[in-house]
Amino acid sequence: MVGCRLGGIGKCRVRHRCGTVDDEVPEVVVMTEVLLAVGTRKGLFIGRRRGGTWEFDDGPRFNAQAVHAVAIDTRGDTPRLLAGGDSSHWGPSVFHSDDLGRTWSEPAQPAVKFPMDTGASLERVWQLHPAAAEPDVVYAGTEPAALYRSEDRGESFTLVRPLWEHPTRSRWVPGGGGEGLHTVLTDARDPRAVTVAVSTAGVFRTTDGGESWAPSNSGVSAAFLPDPDPEFGQCVHKVARDADDPDRLYLQNHWGVYRSDDAGAHWTDIGEGLPATFGFAVAAHPHRGGTAYVFPINADSDRVPADHRCRVFRTPDAGKSWEPLSQGLPQDDHYGTVLRDALCTDDAEPAGVYFGNRNGEVFASADDGDTWEQLASHLPDVLCVRAAVVG
C-alpha cells in the first residue's frame, strides 16, 4: 500500500512496509529528517524521511475517523503534532502528540466547543494553525464557520466572538463541503494581524487582534451571485502567504486564481496560463518569494484534474507565468482530485512539495516540485497533508 521511494543519485534496494522489495530504486542522500502527516477519510497516516528513504508507520492513527486538519508545530524545543479528528460515534475533537505521532492525548474536556448561548454545535475542525508571532498560540477554524484561539499550544480553545458575531454572518451560506473556516494566516511582524477565509463568505481580516473584522475580497469574483463583485460571499477555497513578502497572498477561488500585494485589501487575477482556473489548493514556497503552487481542476461540474493529467503548476514570478510540473506523475486518464488542504510544502532546502488526492494516492517532491515520486496508494480519500523538518 505504501511506497518509500525518492528520486536522486545512485541506486538502492528498498523494502516496503508490506514486505515487497523494489530493485534499482533511485537513492538520494538527505541529511534532514522530514515528517509527513496525511489526514484521510479514515484516519491519520504518518511517514518519515531519513537518509533519503521514506517509511510509514503501520496502520492509521484515529482509525475510521475523518482527519480534516493537521498541524506540525516546530516552534518549541519539542515538535507538537495537532490533529482534528471526527468520529461518527464520539464526534469531533482535537488531539495532540509530543513524540512525532507515536502517542496521542485528548483533553478531558472538549478542546473546541461552542458556548451554549451561540445555539451552535461543532461539526468538525477544518484548520489548525500555529501562530507565527506567538509561541504558544494556535488557531482553529471550524464548521460552523468560526475562529478559535488557544494559548496553551492547542489543548484548549476560546471562541473569537467578534468574528462569530460579525454583522454579515446571517448572510453566510455553506459551500459544497459545508460552512467552514478553512484558512488561518498569521503575520510574524504583528500578532494582531490575522487573515481567515470562509466557504462561502470570503476573506476577512483583523488588525487589532480579533476585536474587529472586515471583508477583504475586492477584485475576487463571485460569478454564481446576482452581483458578481460583492463585498463578501465569495467561495474562496484556500489562501497562502508568500515567503519573502508577507503582504503578498495567493488565493484559489471557486473560479479564478488571484494575488494580493497589500495583505488582501485588493486582489488581481493571475490565472492566465493555467489549463483551468477552478481548483481547491494553493501553497507557497517556504523560502523563495514569488513562487506558489496550484493543482488545476477542470470545472466545478467536472471535478477531475485538468485534461485528466496529474500536474502541479508552479509560478516563479508571483503569477505572471505558470509552468506544469509532471515528471514522475501519472499523465493518462487520471482522476485524482486534490482538496484544499491536500497540497503543502515543508521547510527544507530545497523545499519538499507534497499532495494527496481522493484516489488515496500521495506524491512527494524533494526538489521544489521539479520531480515527483509516489509515496502511497490505496489510502482512503486524502483530506489534508502537512510536512516539516523535525531533525
Whereabouts are the PLM-identified features?
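Extracellular glycan-interacting surfaces
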Residues: 4-7, 12, 16-391
